């Protein structure tokens, strides 16, 4: 066994060899030494367990080849680009929607240059970082003022912490939502230091339920848009308009968490309707919060719009600094919002709407092209077809609504062959992510952004 151990090269010898010098120049001394030590430790363990030298230790070139492979893997960016063919357009686990070219340009410009982030150029003095984008948001929503934080959950937390710490918040039991990752409205309330008061039942809540719960310790009445589920059947809910009238009697504010949020009429685009921010503002809701990286089609952020006196209080709360956005996100968000000044161009300029509004004819053509490329790459174990599919918006938006779509389906007699194919797709330079259903592997083209790049990659694979 000692003879086997002596066959393992010393770290110093590997460092001084020509191959070692080359790898150190490319990857750095520390990284090279770490990988070399790991490889040597692996060899020692195999000698102890199996009384034999690993095959790669027989040739020095094989040792350096393995070190280089491991260094290359670790150098790769962990957030790899992927092709989304799941049929879920705004797939949370795949980064949701793509930014528009204008948003990318604005973000890149902010990265490369100083910007007037908290500086009033006209007055020549310090300002707050939301001031410029607030003016645009006010124009789009009709609100008195606006505040931007890093996501909608942060927006809800900030509103609760500012106005309800140590007080009670009244919410319908049917609106106590849980979003991805077991993140619940009651948990946010507990974190903000306020008490949740549930009213009504899961399926029915009346105006008098709210009225009966109001007392001297009530901070505000809250509406939560159930964007990721829908209760049907024997149901009753209270509208924002009704809640606003009730709140006025007790001089209380009404706060609405819209979740996905929309600044355009989805029905006009031929898509399922979703509550619009402007509608809630017009209904008299005091504060409305919504996401920016879902239906809005922008970067991850959360916007709060509403009464100026309330927004001013949010801006001055210490938590606002913790939750604020940087210059890159604010620049990208402003560029995204400017698209909404010209709603007739949304389907041409915002990738989210480009994907959602594709015609069946366009999708059929894409699916046929994808099938043709795959047919040239897959063997006889796989049967490919172009089939109708049902896509969805995703990210908790309109959970009960589907979009007609088209997919390439792959069938194999053996399930193991389909699993092997999925593994092959995931091993591509930019992995292809599909879904399993009905004993087939589905590649839904509605959610496939950068479609030409996808075909080119498959042609070259």
From Swiss-Prot:
Which InterPro entries does the UniProt record give? PyrdxlP-dep_Trfase, PyrdxlP-dep_Trfase_major, SelA-like, SelA_trans, SelA_trans_N_dom
> What's an example of a GO molecular-function annotation for this chain?
L-seryl-tRNA(Sec) selenium transferase activity
Q: Which cofactor does it need?
A: pyridoxal 5'-phosphate
Q: Does the keyword Transferase apply?
A: yes
Q: Pfam family example for this protein?
A: Se-cys_synth_N
N6-(pyridoxal phosphate)lysine is carried by which residues? 294
Alphabetical GO CC annotations of the entry are:
cytoplasm
Protein family according to the UniProt entry? Belongs to the SelA family.
Q: What is this protein called?
A: L-seryl-tRNA(Sec) selenium transferase
Organism, scientific name: Actinobacillus pleuropneumoniae serotype 7 (strain AP76)
Identify the gene encoding this protein: selA
């Amino acid at each position: 066994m000692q003879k086997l151990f002596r066959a393992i090269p010393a770290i110093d010898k590997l460092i001084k060899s020509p191959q070692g010098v080359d790898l150190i120049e490319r990857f750095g001394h520390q990284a090279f030494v770490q990988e070399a030590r790991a490889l040597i430790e692996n060899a020692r363990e195999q000698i102890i367990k199996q009384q034999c030298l690993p095959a790669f230790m027989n040739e020095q070139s094989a040792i350096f080849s393995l070190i280089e492979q491991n260094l290359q893997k670790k150098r790769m960016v962990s957030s790899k680009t992927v092709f989304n063919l799941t049929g879920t357009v705004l797939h949370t686990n795949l980064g949701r929607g793509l930014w528009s070219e204008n948003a990318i340009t604005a973000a890149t410009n902010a990265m490369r240059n100083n910007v007037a982030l908290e500086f009033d150029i006209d007055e020549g003095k310090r300002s707050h970082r939301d001031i410029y984008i607030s003016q645009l948001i006010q124009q789009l929503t009709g609100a008195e003022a606006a505040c931007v934080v890093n996501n909608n959950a942060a927006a809800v937390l900030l509103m609760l912490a500012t106005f309800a710490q140590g007080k009670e918040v009244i919410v319908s039991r049917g609106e106590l939502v849980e979003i991805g990752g077991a993140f619940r409205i009651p948990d946010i309330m507990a974190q903000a230091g306020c008490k949740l008061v549930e009213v009504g039942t899961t399926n029915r809540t009346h105006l008098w339920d709210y009225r009966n719960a109001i007392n001297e310790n009530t901070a505000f009445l809250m509406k939560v848009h159930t964007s990721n589920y829908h209760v049907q059947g024997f149901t009753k809910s209270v509208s924002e308009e009704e809640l606003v009238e009730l709140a006025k009697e007790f001089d209380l504010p009404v706060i609405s968490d819209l979740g996905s949020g929309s600044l355009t009429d989805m029905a006009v685009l031929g898509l399922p309707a979703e509550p619009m921010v402007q509608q809630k503002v017009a209904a008299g809701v005091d504060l409305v919060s919504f996401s920016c990286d879902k239906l809005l089609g922008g970067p991850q952020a959360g916007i709060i719009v509403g009464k100026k006196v309330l927004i001013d209080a949010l801006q001055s709360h210490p938590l606002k600094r913790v939750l604020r956005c940087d210059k890159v996100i604010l620049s990208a968000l402003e560029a995204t919002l400017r698209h909404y000044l010209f709603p007739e161009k949304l389907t041409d300029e915002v990738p989210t709407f480009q994907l959602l509004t594709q015609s069946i004819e366009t999708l059929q053509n894409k699916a046929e092209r994808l099938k043709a490329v795959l047919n040239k790459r897959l063997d006889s174990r796989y049967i490919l077809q172009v089939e109708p599919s049902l896509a969805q918006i995703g990210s908790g938006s309109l959970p009960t609504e589907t979009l007609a779509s088209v997919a390439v389906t792959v069938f194999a007699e053996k399930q193991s062959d389909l699993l092997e194919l999925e593994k092959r797709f995931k091993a591509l330079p930019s992995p292809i992510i599909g879904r399993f259903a009905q004993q087939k592997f589905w590649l839904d083209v509605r959610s496939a952004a950068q479609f030409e790049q996808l075909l080119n990659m498959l042609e070259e694979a």
